[in-house]
């Protein structure tokens, strides 16, 4: 019997012009940053269903941020908007001149969430950080984060700095979708087993359409803590370039005297990246190991997937 889809309601909210639709279009609709300039303002609520990892469907509510719409969300549409929410993503324009009003609307959202979906996870994105002078970004973000955490009580919120012009958008959205994957701990355990079996330094699992990182394993600390989202951004751009040439991205191998890295189609919904610090291991051996693990990870993607882990045969 085929698995039924598991729908997760995600609210995307924030003042008009804060950049909600632009980031949604980049992550889920394959826009590049410069093309988002032609997007118009969202009218009321735009619904979209994004299939993610096969059975998981993100029911994304992109809520227009004009004052009239915002007031309606908290009055006549309150129950409809805020009922059965899994995740609230609130986007703040870091250069907004109406910060007090932004915070007021955010707190109104939290009150409605507490009443209708008290278990929802809250994410705050301090957006358009590219407009802030580089030497001021850490300080400004830290101040905003402290304010948002204080205003969010008794709820917890996770804060991210974001920009459509760099990899920070992928870091934030990878963290968000990670919270929505039902069997993520089982996935991570099997990814760790897989990495240890093939003697890999790192293994990353990317969602196939968005190239968001959904799981990873590393056996030792690496110098660049932002490398995952950088890879997401680079490969997503490369995939889009391939599409413009009527070609599809299949796989990639990068190798030098210190390491070998492989990116390959893994399951019907994922790509895998394997990093080996022993470049003497033949490429063919690693690619065979990836191929042999595919069937097992295909089963894991189902909500009712197997409870056993990947072990050496």
Curated annotation (Swiss-Prot):
Changing residue 230 to R: Prevents RRAGA ubiquitination and alters interaction and regulation by GATOR1. It comes from the Eukaryota. Keywords: Apoptosis, Cytoplasm, GTP-binding, Host-virus interaction, Hydrolase, Isopeptide bond, Lysosome, Membrane, Nucleotide-binding, Nucleus, Phosphoprotein, Ubl conjugation. It is found in: Cytoplasm; Nucleus; Lysosome membrane. The keyword Zinc does not apply. Changing residue 154 to A: Abolished interaction with TFE3 and TFEB without affecting interaction with RPTOR. It catalyses: GTP + H2O = GDP + phosphate + H(+). The gene is RRAGA. It comes from Homo sapiens. GDP binds at residues 17-22, 36, 42, 127, 130, 148, 164. GTP binds at residues 16-17, 19-22, 36, 42, 65, 127, 164. There is a cross-link at residues 142, 220, 230, 244 (Glycyl lysine isopeptide (Lys-Gly) (interchain with G-Cter in ubiquitin)). This is Ras-related GTP-binding protein A.
């Amino acid at each position: 019997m085929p698995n039924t889809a598991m729908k997760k309601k995600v609210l995307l909210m924030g003042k008009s012009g804060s950049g909600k639709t632009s980031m949604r279009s980049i992550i889920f609709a394959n826009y590049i940053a410069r093309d988002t300039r032609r997007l118009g303002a969202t009218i009321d609520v735009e619904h979209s269903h994004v299939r993610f990892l096969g059975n998981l469907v993100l029911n994304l509510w992109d809520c227009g941020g004009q004052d009239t719409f915002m007031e309606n969300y908290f009055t006549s549409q309150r129950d409809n908007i805020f009922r059965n929410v899994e995740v609230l993503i609130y986007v703040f324009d870091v250069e907004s001149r109406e910060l007090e009003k932004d915070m007021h609307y955010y707190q109104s959202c939290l009150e409605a969430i507490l009443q209708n979906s008290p278990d929802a996870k809250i994410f705050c994105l301090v957006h358009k950080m590219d407009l802030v002078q580089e030497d001021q970004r850490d300080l400004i973000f830290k101040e905003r984060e402290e304010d948002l955490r204080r205003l969010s009580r008794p709820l917890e919120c996770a804060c991210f700095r974001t920009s459509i012009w760099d990899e920070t958008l992928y870091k934030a959205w990878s963290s968000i979708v990670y919270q929505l994957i039902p069997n993520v701990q089982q996935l991570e355990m099997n990814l760790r087993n897989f990495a240890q079996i093939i003697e890999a330094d790192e293994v990353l699992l990317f969602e196939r359409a968005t190239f968001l990182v959904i799981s990873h394993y590393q056996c030792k600390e690496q110098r660049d803590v932002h490398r995952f989202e950088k890879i997401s951004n680079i490969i997503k751009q490369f995939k889009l370039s391939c599409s413009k040439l009527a070609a599809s991205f299949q796989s990639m191998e990068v190798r030098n005297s210190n390491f070998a890295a492989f990116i390959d189609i893994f399951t019907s919904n994922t790509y895998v990246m394997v990093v080996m610090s022993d470049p003497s291991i033949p490429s063919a051996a690693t690619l065979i190991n990836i191929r042999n693990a595919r069937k097992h990870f295909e089963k894991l993607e189902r909500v009712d997937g197997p409870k056993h882990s990947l072990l050496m045969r």
